[in-house]
Design a protein with these regions (language model features):
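Interaction-interface detector
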Residues: 1-141, 148, 173-201
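Exposed beta-sheet edge/beta-hairpin loop segments within beta-rich domains
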Residues: 150-157
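Short, charged, amphipathic alpha-helical segments
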Residues: 157-166, 188-189
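Short Gly/Pro-enriched loop/turn and capping motifs at secondary-structure junctions
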Residues: 152, 169-170
Length: 201
């Protein structure tokens, strides 16, 4: 993407072909001399944060210190859970099938109705805690059979395996605590980027 910049203002943006549809270039590529003569500059991009943690919205192309820059708005996602509500602010509930609901004469019974369980919009802390638990469960699943064997037949779990499993559980607990203590999205991202799961020996 390029921009034509004249008198400290962007007058047009697009590809070279879009900006100069009637001009042909040797080798099909505009050289730097042409770009300079026509006041063409490459568009650079402002910061785009990790979209796991931020809602990223593309904005306008603006001049920043004379450089055409594609702007982005990075809005942090919500950390905590919140009640799900409709457009009028009414609480939403998890729906269940009521097989006995009477729909009137000549109609089959049954309807989806509200339960007493609130519908919740999960925040990042809940989402990341679930991911951490899933990782721990996946790592432990490989040796769960040894735990079952120990319980059912009293066959000892190898010490290396016991140490590994304990380390997985410890790391999971550490991460859950750190996630819960994260004060903002950047702190939460730092926790998730610093996961230190043990390696099997």
């Amino acid at each position: 993407m390029y921009a034509i910049v004249k008198d400290a203002a962007i007058t047009a943006t697009g590809t070279i072909k879009q900006l100069f549809p009637n001009t042909s270039f040797a080798g099909g590529v505009a050289n730097e001399e042409f770009k300079t003569a026509e006041d063409v500059k490459s568009v650079v991009h402002s910061e785009v944060k990790d979209q796991k943690y931020y809602f990223v919205t593309e904005g306008n192309i603006e001049l920043v210190d004379g450089v055409p820059t594609q702007q982005y708005t990075n809005a942090a996602k919500r950390l905590e859970d919140e009640d799900a509500k409709d457009d009028d602010g009414n609480q939403l509930y998890v729906q269940v099938w009521d097989a006995d609901y009477d729909n009137g004469a000549g109609k089959d019974k049954g309807k989806m109705v509200n339960s007493s369980e609130k519908l919740i919009n999960q925040g990042l802390k809940t989402v990341m805690t679930s991911q951490v638990k899933e990782t721990a469960n996946t790592l432990l699943a490989k040796t769960d059979w040894m735990v079952i064997r120990k319980y059912e037949r009293d066959v000892a779990i190898p010490s290396a395996t016991a140490t590994y499993r304990a380390a997985v559980i410890t790391e999971c607990a550490r991460l859950e605590t750190a996630i819960g203590n994260a004060s903002d999205v950047d702190a939460l991202k730092a926790v998730m980027d610093a996961q230190d799961w043990p390696k099997e020996g």
